[in-house]
Amino acid sequence: MPDCPFCLLEKPRILLENDFAAAISDRFPVAPGHTLVIPKQHVASLFDLPQEEQSALWRLVALVRDKLKIEIAADGFTVGVNDGLAAGQTVMHAHVHVIPRRNGDVADPRGGVRWIIPDKARYWTEGHA
């Protein structure tokens, strides 16, 4: 797609790649090392990829995690996908966010991705069982 920022990635931006996916640094990182893993085929949803391409994408996610664990000594990772407008997807080319985390980067990391709906995030507290 000519207007898609992920369809025509410039080679210098690519950190890692395989036959079906490429990894690049996020241009608006929420943490140092925030990386996007993007299928080379233009699809809006990861679920529209053939199984072989989904598998290759997730293998690349694992390689990115391994690389970041060594390079920036991440203590953990938040890995996520915004699939569809209702989920917050702003670039309609599927991609996976790999966000390195450090102990102490937020006051209380419990709940992780549950914070997308703040009223549901503190499931471990009384009254949320």
List the predicted regions and their residue ranges.
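HIT superfamily nucleotide-processing domains
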Residues: M1-A129
